[in-house]
Amino acid sequence: MTKPRVLISDQMDPKAEQIFRERGCDVDVITGKTPEELGEIIGQYDGLAIRSTTKLTKELIARATNLKVVGRAGIGVDNIDIPAASVKGIVVMNTPFGNSITTAEHAIALMFALARQLPEADASTQAGKWEKNRFMGVEVTGKTLGLIGAGNIGSIVASRALGLKMKVVAFDPFLTPERAVEMGVEKADLETLLAKADFITLHTPLTDQTRNILSRENLAKTKSGVRIINCARGGLIDEAALKDALDSGQVGGAALDVFETEPAKASPLFGTPNFISTPHLGASTDEAQVNVAIQVAEQLSDYLVNGGVTNALNMPSLSAEEAPKLRPYMALAERLGSLVGQLAHGNLDKISIEVEGAAAQLNPKPITGAVLAGLMRRYSDTVNMVNAPFLAKERGLDVREVRHDREGVYHTLVRVTVATSQGDRSVAGTLFGNTQPRLVEIFGIGIEAELDGNMLYIVNEDAPGFIGRLGTLLGENGINIGTFNLGRRDAGGEAVLLLSVDSAVPQDVLEQAQKLPGVKVVKALAF
């Protein structure tokens, strides 16, 4: 078996390379390449490990013909075109926990630096001045910290602030009341936070919803003299508006570790009193660099070797422990999706994926992704579990997941139903021995079949002699039957045949089969 090939294109702790090799990957460390130089070699690799220097653009992704996964050693993925990667079927991962403590500590450090004006006091003292009265600070004890974003890093900042006897008010649309109580913070809307906070710290990703969340308008709503810290992403604060707010005294101080444009060689904020800047140092500790390197290597190798998906940004996470359990279900789901995609006629409007029995106890997202991957092959031959949901969304397909804990005739069941302009079509399958996918129902007719290779699907009137005539036709044309599976509604009614054949059935043979007495539908299938 060929080993997966991984490229490390940014400076990274040597432990990353060591882990890749220990886990069965071939790895090259090639740093400092221009985008054009990187484009010349990226097509050789299955995996790519980067930090913030490499920019994985749409153009570069187009040249990554074999790339299956990219891992960002760190949290921010501004340097990766995730939509382009998703359409290409490339999994995008980050390592959100490796530098969480480091970043949280940097935010707390900047808060203290603002409270006591430490950088300016240091510069003044080293200039031979002794300006004790000029640098009067404030205590943080008893003050209110406004937390914009209460995820992993935000929750660590909250914990440290509570240890300093501060009050913490948090704004986060995903923060539940129960989680707020658990964290010991007050959940609030943004306007309430702006009005109450003595210090504001941001810990949220940059999205269309959060861009300029501290806009000119919102800065005007803050408590007079508020101090603001941003160790999250540039673009969360309107920097020109922040400059004006500092000049007017509405904002008493600001400390930014991140900027709208980086490297920040120029900014309207530079030179402003009560402003502190650091060059994106949030993750810059020895411990964090080792942690993110280890984590990105573990995550990428798990995916390339075992199929485990951890901290993916464009597909459901799937641990290396879950992967072996889900793999047969995903194989079943993909074949069911492929079957219904090949047989359904008309425009697809909706798809329902139902899991029953043992399947209902598993993570449904990989099963859904596999169904869509099989289904969407009618549109694209490069589809996989990563890009299938995006392709489905592009086409306006309504995707629904339904879980039934009950156990029916089969201990586990996956059912796929599509609604088209010509009616609903449904297929269902199970696992034999928990590992072997089997079709057990097609369009309401019970049938047991293994979906594999080249197959022939026939709907006919159930009548004596038909099977013999069909066998003769195939034999005369050199088509060898591997397996033969039959289902019917009632004796003498409609019957369904699924035959596996050793080679693809030519179009002229399909046309001859269509002319056999009693035949309603003939369709060649491929899995």
Residue ranges of predicted features:
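An N-terminal-biased, well-structured beta-alpha scaffold segment characteristic
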Residues: 1-93, 215-217
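Rossmann-like dinucleotide/phosphate-binding beta-alpha-beta segment
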Residues: 14, 133-224
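Short beta->alpha connector loops at strand-helix junctions that form conserved
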Residues: 30-31, 51, 73-74, 89-101, ...
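Phosphate-binding beta-alpha-beta segment of Rossmann-like dinucleotide-binding domains, i.e.
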Residues: 88, 96-144, 148, 156-159, ...
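Rossmann-like dinucleotide-binding domain for NAD(H)/NADP(H)
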Residues: 88, 92-93, 216, 225-343, ...
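Oxidoreductase and adenylate-handling cofactor-binding alpha/beta cores
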Residues: 104-123, 143, 159-166, 294-307, ...
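A conserved regulatory-domain signal marking ACT and ACT-like small-molecule sensing domains
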Residues: 317-319, 324-360, 364-527
